[in-house]
Amino acid sequence: MVLSQRQRDELNRAIADYLRSNGYEEAYSVFKKEAELDMNEELDKKYAGLLEKKWTSVIRLQKKVMELESKLNEAKEEFTSGGPLGQKRDPKEWIPRPPEKYALSGHRSPVTRVIFHPVFSVMVSASEDATIKVWDYETGDFERTLKGHTDSVQDISFDHSGKLLASCSADMTIKLWDFQGFECIRTMHGHDHNVSSVAIMPNGDHIVSASRDKTIKMWEVQTGYCVKTFTGHREWVRMVRPNQDGTLIASCSNDQTVRVWVVATKECKAELREHEHVVECISWAPESSYSSISEATGSETKKSGKPGPFLLSGSRDKTIKMWDVSTGMCLMTLVGHDNWVRGVLFHSGGKFILSCADDKTLRVWDYKNKRCMKTLNAHEHFVTSLDFHKTAPYVVTGSVDQTVKVWECR
């Protein structure tokens, strides 16, 4: 590249200033003579430190160029492997991609839970503002608010048909809502403290709940009566989730354990105790993932010939653990989050795990290689909850920043 006469003159003066101000007197006088420079004080001021400034700005720009090049390469790779026009990925391998499709505002306090409806193109969010909101995830439209709780709504759960919605709250109640008429049809009292988790059992006849009163209770949907109480946790029970056939329930607690209970007998079948802090969340592995898990972990197929069941747990110790419930063994620990893990679940294709945490990220894990394969900076504040649609390519997240975000997978 050829410099113009003016640029050459400016460069020479900047070099002369650099030589003089750094004490290279001899080199300065030779250079000044050879470059035929007529130095005067006014001009000197203009070129003082100019060479160093140019040099540092070039380095800064080089760094920026390298960052942009790496982002461009990543985008190209994503476009060819996952973009709508590139080579088609198997839907089982679709993962959430930034940016979000929608960022939905409306809650006036942190969002505590987000879930998809099993049938319609809606999702539901619960919040510390004591409300439940319904949104259309395809259009991003707000549909309605369900009001009835008098304190933070902690968890929500649909039955398999999506006709009933259960919610639980720090107001110590569990409510059952008719999701067709959007009316509260039953309120259940019985816990002595904040009810932190609720789930409708797969058969739709019973609801299970967990509380800060250290108990897990089972309720009859038809009557609202409490029919069973499971005791054993020594601290606040954070979450409770039934397995696919409803014969087992898993729970996690501030006592740093995960427990698995036999519903019929109320017996604690397993106590899983390798976390080093409060266990915030749990999730059962779908049967579609059993073969991938067995392959990844080398776990034995039992006498029954069936592997599993398998369970995931996420903790304030910043780790995610995978457990073989039948043996009580921890099969793997995934490390990567920089803060409390608040939500964890299996990808519907069975090959990946998704998690969210107080480090404001949503992460996708390739558990076969025990590595985090994608990190999305999902929210401005802690990410409290996530859900993965069973059939449509969407993930939803909720946050302390009061927003709900919809992420498209491809």
Curated annotation (Swiss-Prot):
Residues 83-410 are annotated as: Interaction with dynein and dynactin. One of its GO terms (molecular function) is identical protein binding. It holds the Pfam family LisH_PAC1. Changing I15R: Impairs self-association and reduces protein stability. One of its GO terms (biological process) is regulation of postsynapse organization. The keyword Cell division applies. The keyword Transport applies. Disruption phenotype: Double heterozygous PAFAH1B1 and homozygous VLDLR knockout mice present no obvious cortical layering defects. Double heterozygous PAFAH1B1 and homozygous LRP8 knockout mice display a reeler-like phenotype in the forebrain consisting of the inversion of cortical layers and hippocampal disorganization. Residues 56-82 form a coiled coil. Residues 1-102, 388-410 are annotated as: Interaction with NDEL1. InterPro entries: Dynein_regulator_LIS1, G-protein_beta_WD-40_rep, LIS1_N, LisH, PAC1-like_LisH-like_dom, WD40/YVTN_repeat-like_dom_sf, WD40_repeat_CS, WD40_repeat_dom_sf. The modification N6-acetyllysine is found at K53. WD repeats lie at residues 106-147, 148-187, 190-229, 232-271, 274-333, 336-377, 378-410. Its main location: cytoplasm. Residues 7-39 form the LisH domain. Keywords: Acetylation, Cell cycle, Cell division, Coiled coil, Cytoplasm, Cytoskeleton, Developmental protein, Differentiation, Lipid degradation, Lipid metabolism, Membrane, Microtubule, Mitosis, Neurogenesis, Nucleus, Phosphoprotein, Repeat, Transport, WD repeat. Originally the subunits of the type I platelet-activating factor (PAF) acetylhydrolase was named alpha (PAFAH1B1), beta (PAFAH1B2) and gamma (PAFAH1B3). Now these subunits have been renamed beta (PAFAH1B1), alpha2 (PAFAH1B2) and alpha1 (PAFAH1B3) respectively. Component of the cytosolic PAF-AH (I) heterotetrameric enzyme, which is composed of PAFAH1B1 (beta), PAFAH1B2 (alpha2) and PAFAH1B3 (alpha1) subunits. The catalytic activity of the enzyme resides in the alpha1 (PAFAH1B3) and alpha2 (PAFAH1B2) subunits, whereas the beta subunit (PAFAH1B1) has regulatory activity. Trimer formation is not essential for the catalytic activity. This is Platelet-activating factor acetylhydrolase IB subunit beta.
